[in-house]
Amino acid sequence: MKNENKMMKNLGSTLKLGAAFERLSFFVLVLLLLCHFVGCLWIFVGRTIGEGDSWIESGGFEDYTIMELYTVSTYFTMTTITTVGYGDISGTTTVEKVICIFLHLIGVISYSFATGSLTSIIANYDSMNDKN
């Protein structure tokens, strides 16, 4: 984590960007890693834990390869966390629904953080332009 943070700080100082941009860049990196891990968890739960038809069976994904399942699960995770949530894939078992609740909470928090960071970047940029 420390090396990634140093990398973001070096990038920010090289590009003459503020701390808000560094935080936002680090946040995007963490969000992408989170989508990967939750996507893998979503596959694991769909294939192993279930008291009935999982999202894999209910969506007709039984014959998909592991890479196709990874793509579908990462798509689901990304659309849920970014609050787009098309609804074409959803949790059907209790465990899957609990994971969806967790993803919804992460989505609200990440959306709020991203909005605040972008507002800070724009405000700092505007104040820097006013000084020049």
Which role does the model predict for each range below?
Residues 8-11, 46-61, 127-131:
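Interhelical loop segments of eukaryotic multi-pass membrane proteins
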Residues 1-2, 22-39, 60-131:
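Pore domain of cation channels
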